[in-house]
């Protein structure tokens, strides 16, 4: 073979060697059965390390059973849900920190999963989440006393009600790590903070927007951007 015919293969080899991570982005969860959820040019990563930048930009791969997951990670494969550690006192915080694991839905022994019976474990998890919210917001776990007019001294703000509904949804539905999950950002009084953001997508920040204390978008503010924009200063917690 003449020297000029060797030049194109040699250049191709050098270009592939110069790319970070080789010819394929190393993405977790690109195994058999879930390959349809992986972007093009994505190879399976056996060591379970962090996804490469190219993989995060493509949206990431579906997480397999036993892999780490959370609110800000790629979804678990179909049929799996992102579950916090079994004896975790703050399950929501564990999911926000990415300390969950993809696994099959936990069903108590001897119970038909199709039957909608109340479960003691679910009630306990809801109580734990409620205590976690109250601890973070600085409110007391004791019920508020009613005044002479029959109205509680401390009423739940609109943002706090919204947050409770999100927590209830996470308890009752199969949680697969939705990329567009919105957890409202509340102040200690239960009202909305000015800056609200959706969950991140891989290594990219989720879209943000500005609202007033009751949750209504401020004039000129719309959902979008990379999450780096700031809201005007002022009242509303």
Curated annotation (Swiss-Prot):
BP GO terms, sorted: cell migration; positive regulation of MAPK cascade; regulation of insulin-like growth factor receptor signaling pathway
Disulfide links within the chain: 27-30, 38-42, 55-61, 69-82, 76-102, 159-186, 197-208, 210-231
One GO CC term on file: extracellular space
Stretch forming the signal peptide: 1-25
Location of the Thyroglobulin type-1 domain: 156-231
GO molecular function, one term: insulin-like growth factor II binding
Regions of compositional bias (Polar residues) in chain numbering: 135-151
Gene: IGFBP6
Main location: secreted
Taxonomic superkingdom: Eukaryota
Modifications the protein undergoes after translation, according to the UniProt entry: O-glycosylated.
Compartmental location: Secreted
Native source species: Bos taurus
Keywords from the UniProt entry: Disulfide bond, Glycoprotein, Growth factor binding, Secreted, Signal
Protein name stated in the entry: Insulin-like growth factor-binding protein 6
Chain positions covered by the region annotation Disordered: 101-158, 215-237
Function: IGF-binding proteins prolong the half-life of the IGFs and have been shown to either inhibit or stimulate the growth promoting effects of the IGFs on cell culture. They alter the interaction of IGFs with their cell surface receptors. Activates the MAPK signaling pathway and induces cell migration.
């Amino acid at each position: 073979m003449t020297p000029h015919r060797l030049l194109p293969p040699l250049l191709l080899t050098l270009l592939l060697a110069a790319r970070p991570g080789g010819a394929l982005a190393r993405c977790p969860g690109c195994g058999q059965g879930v390959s349809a959820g992986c972007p093009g040019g994505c190879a399976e990563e056996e060591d379970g390390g962090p996804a490469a930048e190219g993989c995060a930009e493509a949206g990431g791969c579906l997480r397999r059973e036993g892999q780490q997951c959370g609110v800000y990670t790629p979804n678990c494969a179909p049929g799996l849900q992102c579950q916090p550690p079994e004896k975790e006192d703050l399950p929501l915080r564990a999911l926000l920190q990415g300390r969950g694991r993809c696994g099959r839905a936990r069903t108590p022994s001897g119970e038909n999963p199709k039957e909608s019976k109340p479960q003691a474990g679910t009630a306990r998890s809801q109580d734990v989440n409620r205590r976690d919210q109250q601890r973070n917001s600085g409110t007391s776990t004791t019920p508020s006393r009613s005044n002479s007019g029959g109205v509680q001294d401390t009423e739940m703000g609109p943002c706090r009600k919204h947050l409770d509904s999100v927590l209830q949804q996470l308890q009752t539905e199969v949680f697969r790590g939705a990329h567009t999950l919105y957890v409202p950002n509340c102040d200690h009084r239960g009202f909305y903070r000015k800056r609200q953001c959706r969950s991140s997508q891989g290594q990219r920040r989720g879209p943000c927007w500005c609202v007033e204390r009751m949750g209504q978008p401020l004039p000129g503010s719309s959902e979008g951007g990379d999450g780096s924009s700031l809201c005007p200063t002022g009242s509303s917690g």
